[in-house]
């Protein structure tokens, strides 16, 4: 079983039902093209299943977590994340934090000095698949095996 998932909100804020909006807010995905890393638990899996028509997710590896933290991680004042921002936490550096996030031992919402989400840009050269369909129907939504390449093009 996976230690953690990378979750990216693909669809925007218009015409989203209240129940889905609430779930997306709990996942810290309030805007389009935001990503977060969540631990793989039974309740988070249920939340992902509930909003599968608005987000895409995949198991995350330490390399992608490291890339997200160094390039898109934000600390206090929305400044780039540095080693100094992690002082006073259980993680001496960004690499250790990335490993802990990828294995599910750490949670982004529990670390006070970093933003619990990553603001991504739209993918370079566009989406290769439909943003209106599930992954099994030639789309990008839901459990997506190719999400890591998509996220790398959005960083």
Curated annotation (Swiss-Prot):
Instruction: List the keywords (alphabetical).
Output: Ribonucleoprotein, Ribosomal protein
**MF (Gene Ontology):** RNA binding; structural constituent of ribosome
Entry keyword annotation includes Ribonucleoprotein: yes
A GO cellular component annotated for this chain's UniProt record is: cytosolic large ribosomal subunit
Keyword Ribosomal protein assigned to the entry: answer is yes
Q: Name one GO biological process term.
A: translation
Q: Which InterPro entries match?
A: Ribo_uL30_ferredoxin-like_sf, Ribosomal_uL30, Ribosomal_uL30_arc, Ribosomal_uL30_euk_arc, Ribosomal_uL30_ferredoxin-like
Task: Fill in the subunit field for this protein.
Answer: Part of the 50S ribosomal subunit.
NCBIfam families from the entry? PRK06049.1 (NF004711)
Q: Which family does it belong to?
A: Belongs to the universal ribosomal protein uL30 family.
Q: Which HAMAP family match?
A: Ribosomal_uL30_A (MF_01371_A)
Protein name (Swiss-Prot/TrEMBL): Large ribosomal subunit protein uL30
